[in-house]
Amino acid sequence: MPLSQEESTLIERATATINSIPISEDYSVASAALSSDGRIFTGVNVYHFTGGPCAELVVLGTAAAAAAGNLTCIVAIGNENRGILSPCGRCRQVLLDLHPGIKAVVKDSDGQPTAVGIRELLPSGYMNRA
C-alpha cells in the first residue's frame, strides 16, 4: 500500500535530520514521528559503549516533553544513505507499550516503504501491564 503524504513527510524529515549532522558512529540514525494533532518530532540516537537510546526512543521522549499525546506513525533513517531501518526489538516493545496504535514505516519484501502496525512487527510482545 502506498504511503500517505504524512508518512512520506516523516521519511523526508528524518532523512533531513540525519543528513544535517556530521557522519558519526555516535549519531548514526534519525527518527521522526507524527502525533495525532499533526506535529512532527525528530531525534537521533546516542551511541555509547554503556548503552544508549535508539533514535525512536529519543523521539518518544521529545514528543512526551512537548505533551504530544498519541503518536500515530514513526520512521527511522540510517546515515550514509542506509535509508529506512526497521525498529529494533527493544524499540518495538517500547512502541507497543506506550503507543499500541502506532504504525512504523519499514521496507516491505520488495524493498519498498510501507507503514505497518506495531503489533504486526511484534505480534507476541511481552505484556508488562495487566
Curated annotation (Swiss-Prot):
A cellular-component GO term for this protein: cytosol
Keyword presence, ATP-binding: no
Family matches, as PANTHER family: CYTIDINE DEAMINASE
Statement: the UniProt record of this protein carries the keyword Cell membrane: no
Organism lineage string: Eukaryota, Fungi, Dikarya, Ascomycota, Pezizomycotina
Cofactor(s) listed: Zn(2+)
UniProt xrefs under Pfam families: dCMP_cyt_deam_1
Function statement: Catalyzes the deamination of the cytosine moiety of the antibiotics blasticidin S, cytomycin and acetylblasticidin S.
GO molecular function, one term: identical protein binding
Oligomer status and interactors: Homotetramer.
Family designation: Belongs to the cytidine and deoxycytidylate deaminase family.
Alphabetically ordered keywords of this record: Antibiotic resistance, Hydrolase, Metal-binding, Zinc
Catalytic residue positions: 56
Gene Ontology process terms (BP): cytidine deamination; response to antibiotic
Record-listed Zn(2+) binding positions: 54, 88, 91
Domain CMP/dCMP-type deaminase intervals: 1-129
Catalytically driven reaction(s): blasticidin S + H2O + H(+) = deaminohydroxyblasticidin S + NH4(+)
Binding, substrate: 28, 82, 126
Protein name, entry field: Blasticidin-S deaminase
Source organism per UniProt: Aspergillus terreus (strain NIH 2624 / FGSC A1156)
EC code: 3.5.4.23
